[in-house]
Amino acid sequence: MIIDTHAHLTDIKFDNDRKDVIERAFNSGLSRLIEVSCEMCYWYKSLELIKQNNIFASFGIHPIDVLKAVKSDYEKLETLIQNEKCVAVGEIGLDYHYDNCKNNIDAQKESLKVQLDLAKKYSKPVIIHCRDAYDDMIEFIKKQSFMPTGVIHCFSGSLEQAKIFVDLGFYLGIDGPITYKKSDILKEVVKNIEIGKLLVETDCPYLAPQKYKRTRNEPSYIIEIVKEIASIKNMSLNEIEKVTNQNALNLFKGIK
């Protein structure tokens, strides 16, 4: 059985067949999934989704949205984090891909700090989004007065950066790009980082595995990620499923 630790099933791309997608997911061998609700417009839609068995949530304010967020949004977020089926805070982090001006970076760091503090207050792990900002993220985390626990979602950094995050206590999220032909750096990371520090994620509807590339991704496709990791690490599918499943349970303690 596999746990998809990062899905966005409230996305509008699933509006026409969400029920079928969820049914396919659990029929394909998925045991649980985490709905990552990091866009404020989807928060309450996610609350409805997690009423279903074996679907849990993470709530946060995505770095791309921090300039739109106001004080009341953080107050709403704090309430959502206390939901019994909320197992993490996120995805939160730094994203310099679209806008790396100082004002935006400062706002992202301020928001990240607020949300890290909320995670600490309610003893939740964090799901970290990091794009074109790995060195800054490492520096930021090291400066915190406490060390958060969590996962670096959809890791795409170097092996050196991967080792630093693992040394800091983080897991690395491995997604569809591990199956792509031009993913040598990521394959090297997976080869050299112990399986006990890896999580499998789809990030659906984004980043479909090579077999389904250029189509909408969905949780049932997660087996393609597991297969690729097994091939890289010369391990059986069962071993990869068993260890990554336990990794998810160890990190997201609210999953039952």
Q: Where are the model-predicted features located?
A:
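Mid-domain alpha/beta scaffold segments of enzyme catalytic cores
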Residues: 1-256
